[in-house]
Amino acid sequence: DILAAFRVTPQPGVPPEEAGAAVAAESSTGTWTTVWTDGLTSLDRYKGRCYHIDAVPGEENQYICYVAYPLDLFEEGSVTNMFTSIVGNVSGFKALRALRLEDLRIPPAYVKTFQGPPHGIQVERDKLNKYGRPLLGCTIKPKLGLSAKNYGRAVYECLRGGLDFTKDDENVNSQPFMRWRDRFLFCAEALYKAQAETGEIKGHYLNATAGNCDEMIKRAVFARELGVPIVMHDYLTGGFTANTTLSNYCRDNGLLLHIHRAMHAVIDRQKNHGMHFRVLAKALRMSGGDHIHSGTVVGKLEGGRNITLGFVDLLRDDFIEKDRTRGIYFTQDWVSLPGVLPVASGGIHVWHMPALVEIFGDDSVLQFGGGTLGHPWGNAPGAVANRVVLEACVQARNEGRDLAREGXDIXREATKWSPELAAACEVWKEITFTFEEVDKLDY
């Protein structure tokens, strides 16, 4: 069975048992009345069952309801169908004040019907020939308004300075100021020029997201013809059907696939309604993507450390034990489905590097947009600063130093041989994002 953990807030006067049963019925075989066609099938074989209910500590009228769904309710290899069944209609139920899908357990038999990420972590490292450290990226800013030529110039400067990747922002598609074909051409030119000068393999996430699947695939085909290593998709606004289509194309044609989670907070930010990001992360691993944005813990976006590390493990590891202290409600076995690299991006700069390396480890992408392009000396020095402090942190960690405790000292020591890093450290020494988390663990 597929197991689901729902956070249920019933309307006043509705007992939790009734609310849980209603959720199970509405998201499987039930409707609001008995119908004569019920007798034409075996409802016991197909209906969802609410098998356990826990009260949420500290909340007066919230419950975690566990529901089991028989596998025959779902089309093989379709995240679209899975979500249509489990959360397609039930969240608007009048008997519920709010409903949030906290977690899913996907059984191995169903996991095996998905191809998952186009390539996975190890294959990506082999393609890039980069090992033993996190990968470095940068989102080109301003996100909208640059001409294709100026955009390509910024890409070149960042890659030449030492970054592994640069990135289209999520809302860069094909606007009047920069049509997609022009952007692809100038970025490919920048990428090859930077590769020739540095001797390293470089990439730029060319956003193939479009208004329809045919146009999306046309853009991916053009990227492949240019010989670039990676394309990008906004998987929530684009939809799971489009995402799986693009993932299959990338797998067949040797392209890596970077995934942006634009629109996720509309779905996952409220604590009592919607769907937690760990569910969206699991769905992405099934649908297909080699990278996905996961929050930073230390930057400008919402996400506590334990919760974030919980779904980072769900993205990367093959077997993840149940651990409510990290928000993981079920043990998940991915039966060797390739892993996804988490991307830490959003309001991070050189002073965050020790914490990011300590939190995310080597199998991650650390992406500094303003933290590269905001350098007072320019884009290339910003990239140099990030590469120097990253390599200093990795070396210090490998020597046995404690990044959490000695991180600031490690960065200061590295400034002695990098004036670019010294300038970056001075500019961002007082920039912090300290706000209370909205989504906290109950346990």
Curated annotation (Swiss-Prot):
CDD domains: RuBisCO_large_I (cd08212). Pfam families: RuBisCO_large, RuBisCO_large_N. Its EC number is 4.1.1.39. The keyword Disulfide bond applies. One of its GO terms (molecular function) is magnesium ion binding. SUPFAM superfamilies: RuBisCo, C-terminal domain, RuBisCO, large subunit, small (N-terminal) domain. The record marks K300 as: Transition state stabilizer. Substrate binds at N89, T139, K143, R261, H293, S345. Binds 1 Mg(2+) ion per subunit. The active site is at K141, H260. It is an enzyme of class 4 (lyase). It catalyses: 2 (2R)-3-phosphoglycerate + 2 H(+) = D-ribulose 1,5-bisphosphate + CO2 + H2O; D-ribulose 1,5-bisphosphate + O2 = 2-phosphoglycolate + (2R)-3-phosphoglycerate + 2 H(+). Belongs to the RuBisCO large chain family. Type I subfamily. This is Ribulose bisphosphate carboxylase large chain. It comes from Borago officinalis.
